[in-house]
Amino acid sequence: MTLGSKKRIQLMLQYIDIKPSDVLLDVGGNTGKITEVYAKECKAVVVLEPKHAVVEYGRTYRPHIKFVEGRVENIPLPDEYFDKVVASASFHHFPNQDRGLEEMKRILKANGKMIILEIDPTTGRGKRLKVCESILHTKAKFYEPFQLRKKVEEHGMKVLSVKSTSLGYYLTAVKGNQK
């Protein structure tokens, strides 16, 4: 677990507001270690992960969680299936962030919530992470909170809140009744 995981989990649970009837998708959930906490709170949880080896590990060591191999730009899951979609410290890694937002919106039920935890590139921690990402030659793209808010709104989602934390910021948005 990374990014102060224990604290991050507590904050995510607070912002996600999981209901026992919820079906939740964790985008870029890796091996499902954090997802395991969500699984205790909701009806069903799915991890979407692009790396085959990571998916196999998750399936082996967390058989109670469904792992789906795939990319956020083309989520291999049905329309309007999930009550909540969580992207915890993964959005900056999406190769095509606009397409990723469209797909996350597509698989959300009407009035479903999207929760994104991201690193704020204007903070000391965010600046250090950007340097690390550039050293590792990743193509990470970070947004300041107001920029991500605008991007999410451009995709037809209603932003309910953007809250800064010591770990970055949380953006919570809701999908309206439209498809």
Regions picked out by a protein language model, each given a short descriptive name:
Residues 3-20:
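Conserved alpha-helix/loop element of class I SAM-dependent methyltransferases that forms part
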Residues 25, 30-74:
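Class I SAM-dependent methyltransferase SAM/SAH-binding core
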Residues 86:
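A conserved beta-strand element that flanks and buttresses the S-adenosyl-L-methionine
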Residues 89-90:
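Short catalytic micro-motifs in class I SAM-dependent methyltransferases
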Residues 98-110:
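A short glycine-rich, Lys/Arg-flanked "PGG" loop and its adjoining helix->strand segment in the class I
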